[in-house]
UniProtKB/Swiss-Prot annotation:
InterPro entries: BRCT_dom (IPR001357), BRCT_dom_sf (IPR036420), DisA/LigA_HHH (IPR041663), DNA_ligase (IPR001679), DNA_ligase_AS (IPR018239), DNA_ligase_CS (IPR033136), DNAligase_adenylation (IPR013839), DNAligase_N (IPR013840)
Role this protein plays: DNA ligase that catalyzes the formation of phosphodiester linkages between 5'-phosphoryl and 3'-hydroxyl groups in double-stranded DNA using NAD as a coenzyme and as the energy source for the reaction. It is essential for DNA replication and repair of damaged DNA.
Chain sites annotated for binding Zn(2+): C412, C415, C430, C435
Cofactor: Mg(2+); Mn(2+)
EC number: 6.5.1.2
A GO molecular-function descriptor: DNA ligase (NAD+) activity
Protein species of origin: Lacticaseibacillus casei (strain BL23)
Protein name (database record): DNA ligase
Amino acid sequence: MLAKPAAQFTLEEAQAEVEKLRKQLNQWRLEYYTKDAPTVTDNVYDDHYRDLQALEEAYPKLVTPDSPTQEVGDVINSDFAKVQHPIPMLSMGDVFSFEELSEWDARMQSNVGHPVDYNVELKIDGLALSLIYENGKLVQGSTRGDGNVGEDVTRNVLTIASVPKQLKQPLSLEVRGECYMPKAAFAKLNARQETEGGTPFANPRNAAAGSLRQLDAKVTAARELDTFIYTLIEPEQFNVTTQHEAIAFMQALGFTTNPSSEVAGDMQAIDTYIKKYTTDRDALPYGIDGIVLKVNDLALQAQLGNTVKVPRWEIAYKFPPEEAETVIHDIVWTVGRTGVVTPTAVMDPVQLAGTTVARATLHNADMIRDKDIRIGDTVMLHKAGDIIPEVSRVLVAKRPVDTPPAPIPEACPSCGQKLVHLDDEVALRCINPMCPAQVQEQLTHFASRNAMNIDGLGPKIVAQLQAKHLVKDVADLYHLTAADLAKLDKFKEKSINNLLSAINNSRQNSVERLIFGLGIRHVGGKAARILAEHFGDLDHLMTASQEAIADVPNIGPTIAEAIVTYFKAATVQKLITQLREADVNLRYTGPTKPVVKDSFVAGKTVVITGKFAEFSRPALTKQLEGLGAKVTGSVSKKTDLLIAGDAAGSKLAKAQSLNVPIMNETELLANLKD
């Protein structure tokens, strides 16, 4: 919350606070949308976002196009082909109380001059998805991306059972909806992640996003994603006049639509709907985080239009977080793979959002101090993203007399070494490279599916190997023998042979798996692949300068600094030597990006307008991008070529005024044949 009302800030104070809020929000957006690994709850993000909105409303001159309040959605992932959305996929405005929702309805009625019917829908907690069909056949699936340009995830969408590959009628159309992960599938996925030494997903939304954006469609297929479709683009083509009719029309074509949508003509009906699903949401097999109101009349939707970021004809009501009261009996500190020491509250078991909760993350020492959380305190819990239990506040009035502040450790709970703060980070960290807890986490991570993929080497086996002093680092894995493994509990000949075979097979992995498996700070699987493909082998990466690494697309200075620091360590250099001597592959042997041959559009910025006899616009866009073109949605001085079909309209006129070269469909076909 702001220290005072936005209108009481001086311009200088407001500017400083705006810059601070934008920096923080952009970091959280990166974690949420691109890394699929949020570090704060939706409520914390929303509070900061509304503070920024308030300051920008008080001082409009501080609004910039790159402000989080002006941008839509995700940062584009360079691993996927880009898709230009012919009609932008906008975000959605939101409110956080029924009073705010009623005020929005009053403004709506005032604007249009009469009462408004709304189609009321559940707000599915997932990832926005666009599907394009030609003659009834699915030809493209894409994410929202930044609203104008998304990611082509067609191969992954084809693995989702609820997405029809062929419609019940041979129609050409675009629909939009939500890709989500059911609660049961999320529980199975996180159980598998933990068994294989991976990091559990924070919530089903991030699990869905991470699963849909997999480079390997087989991984997506195993994640049990589902969809609800709720938007029909250009419905007038099909004589559909209301949102409720659109949902019925899409359902008749074979799409899965949510059965809970209904038309409401007044706020009393909407209030009843909200109360019903506030109560029943935990019983649903999928996550929802609110209710969506959409003007039901599609012609009125078109009349109301959009702002830069959101439609004026729809709004989301966000549920308040559900809370439960409990007592903290202990705070335990655990050491992670990178040495970060994290506190967890151990509490009386309590029912919260449909599950029994007995532990909750406290994140870091600063949170314990800021909220003054003490052992013995009565606290209120909520579930961040409806999944992760967190302490929302302390009920100080119920605190026992003379309860001391919670002790913050000065030494590592695993190895006893003094804990430190690196740079200006909040986390406490153990920097002992031989810390047993870290080594166990590192070994488990190294063997995980997305790293070296050593099947059968999970946390329990790693713990046994450590306890029997058979391994002290990842290089030791490659010196294990059948006699060594025979010392493990319940390890017979078959298990021994399977594990030795998996370890031996991992020697041949392309080096990006090794880079990821080493657990370098900030280096995830995608960054590891980019680095491996760019440098070709580990030796070139190890000897590259920080500047050279930072210049690699999508890497940047933070990752570059972490890599240089990591490989400077004598213990790391010794480890790499040992891996080399164990015949572990250090070269990139994965697929390389195809080089686009010279074509009439290679490297050019192209705009498409009008209707074509031989192409749909999405198919033509995809074909031109495959030839090396950058296809955009508007004509400017930077446009190299306009491809104009029939009824080209204003884009053709603008291109002519700017002397942009223009190509018709006949000329286009001739060029494509060359």
